């Protein structure tokens, strides 16, 4: 009898990392794969689903304008109960640290359905940084029966918290699997024509805890560095959040060396990352993606749940201070030795076979489901 494996996700970052797993599981003869999306993101989620040719079996469609954490939480909790009761999965897989992840795990706990946590064990141990993600992943860690940790450090965190060693599997990160399918040699985009022979900087900035003064600091530092380096051009696919857009327009709107564009598909995002000179971000996933192509990453956050990259030298945690961002952005543009140290550091996040490992475990390894 086939094992019924249900995957639930709702945001663009989750979809990027879960869609390759969906497609891998669908190749396994002993597994029935069911996909439920919550629609926590809408347009950006749909772009990823199309890229990986994943068609959800269920769509909760909870997104609404101006939604709060309260809206997302109650919207998912009210709708997912019926789906879980109808499907009766043997295991539900959730990913990472979103509100979708937390609420789905909570619903499964209420219904006593086993939870498998993909990208388990990331920690900052400050529940307000990143917010609400750090709380979400710690809470899911209490509920989850099976834990797919991307690195040995993530496994150590789980062991330190009292998780049974037999419930933890070090698999690598599924985002590396995703990039093997999306990055191509003959990629073309009009923005790359605009960049030409200039050094390209890829920027993302959207985190909730960076809204307000921290984000203004980030944008001011970027503007200063661009003004001092006429051979550099930046591409910033901006988040839909109107607060982010307002800050970017105020600080970067008349800067000729940066193109602020609408959100791009994962296919474009990965190909931009593979071709950039370096990346400035407050994202989580990009901290794993860019090192796969030897691209240094300046992390514009006060904490990171991915210290492996900092330890390996692929990431530099620069915080949200204007001067610190300015210092390191300038250093990597002007100092070839500093740049080479980061560009040539080993990627600690996996080899592109994480989905196979997870599927093998689900297909063969769980005698209890």
Where do the protein language model's features map onto the residues?
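Nucleotide-activated sugar donor-binding and catalytic core shared by glycosyltransferases
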Residues: 1-236, 241-369
């Amino acid at each position: 009898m086939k094992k019924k494996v249900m995957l639930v996700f709702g945001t663009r970052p989750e979809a990027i990392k879960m869609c390759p797993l969906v497609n891998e599981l669908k190749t396994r003869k002993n597994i029935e794969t069911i996909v439920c999306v919550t629609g926590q993101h809408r347009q950006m989620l749909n772009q990823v689903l199309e890229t990986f040719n994943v068609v959800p079996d269920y769509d909760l469609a909870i997104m609404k304008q101006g939604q709060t954490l309260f809206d997302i939480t109650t919207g998912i909790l009210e709708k997912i109960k019926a789906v879980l009761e109808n499907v009766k999965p043997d295991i539900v897989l959730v990913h990472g640290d979103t509100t979708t992840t937390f609420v789905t795990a909570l619903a499964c706990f209420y219904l006593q359905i086993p939870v498998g946590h993909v990208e388990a064990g990331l920690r900052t141990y400050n529940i307000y940084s990143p917010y609400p993600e750090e709380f979400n992943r710690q809470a899911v860690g209490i509920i989850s029966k099976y834990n797919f940790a991307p690195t040995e450090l993530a496994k150590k965190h789980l062991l330190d918290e009292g998780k049974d060693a037999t419930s933890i599997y070090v698999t690598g990160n599924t985002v590396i699997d995703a990039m093997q399918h999306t990055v191509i040699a003959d990629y073309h985009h009009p923005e790359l024509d605009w960049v030409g022979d200039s050094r390209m900087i890829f920027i993302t900035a959207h985190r909730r805890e960076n809204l307000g003064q921290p984000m203004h600091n980030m944008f001011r530092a970027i503007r200063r560095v661009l003004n001092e380096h006429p051979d550099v051009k930046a591409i910033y696919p901006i988040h839909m959040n109107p607060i982010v857009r307002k800050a970017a327009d105020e600080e970067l709107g008349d800067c000729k060396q940066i193109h602020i564009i609408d959100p791009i598909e994962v296919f474009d995002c990965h190909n931009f990352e593979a071709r950039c000179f370096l990346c400035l971000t407050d994202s989580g996933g990009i901290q794993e993606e860019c090192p796969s192509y030897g691209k240094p990453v300046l992390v514009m956050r006060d904490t990171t749940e991915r210290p492996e990259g900092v330890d390996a030298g692929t990431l530099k945690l620069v915080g949200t201070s204007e001067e610190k961002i300015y210092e390191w952005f300038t250093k990597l543009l002007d100092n070839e030795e500093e740049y080479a140290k980061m560009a040539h550091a080993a990627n600690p996040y996996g080899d592109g076979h994480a989905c196979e490992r997870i599927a093998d475990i689900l297909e063969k390894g769980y005698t209890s489901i």
